[in-house]
Amino acid sequence: MFIIVGIIMLGLAGGIFFLTKYTATKDLETEIPSQLPIASISSFTQSCIERIAKEAVAQNGVQGGYFEPPPEYVEVANLKIPYFYDGKNDATPPSRTLQKELAKNVQRNLNNCLQDFSFIKDQGYTVETGPIQSDIIFGDSIFFDFTFPVTISAETTSKTIDTFSTRVNVNIPKIIDTYEQIIEQQKIKPNFVMVSYLNDLALEKEVRIELNYIDGDSVLYTIIDQDSLIDEHPYQFTFAIKYDWTKEGK
């Protein structure tokens, strides 16, 4: 494992390309079933949940784990990347924050895939949905458990399905431990980029760390985990650190 240092945001561009390509591909792959038994409705909803969960993990990853950015961030290529450290303040997000941000993303975007079940309603069925509640657990993978009531009715008959689950093969605790160690070490020399230390940390964590210099005083850090895959694409997690180069080395 190794560090790649560059002044052009190649690593970030790759992450954006993957996210765009992944989403476009999945748009084509989502199929609306032509038949309307409960099994088909359940399968369609499950496929949307799986797709949106993967997209949420990928999208939040290239924005430092956030769906809605914190107050301090830098905007790069339409992405709002949070500062985890600015020379004084430690703004590293705990796991519960990353879980909440994933839940926001899924809840906000799920209906983009479900399309309000219009293909069912067009057949004369009535569909009612309740609020989405999520339980997200971080381990070697991300485990999503959802309570999402979907009631399908026709004349005097109705049926409700309400529990769904999926997992995404991304090791978030490993990512959290990596960025927390980077920030703790950065506090020792707030205005010094610790290339040697980052090399050692990348080897220890079995990740790749890419640095991209932007905006004169900011550096983007991208942690790439080849063992955490979303449809065979390595997971990427990007955050920013702000430096005062007039005090470099201090």
Which residue ranges define each predicted feature?
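Long, compositionally biased, intrinsically disordered regions
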Residues: 5-250
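N-terminal positive-inside, membrane-proximal cytosolic segments immediately preceding the first
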Residues: 1-2
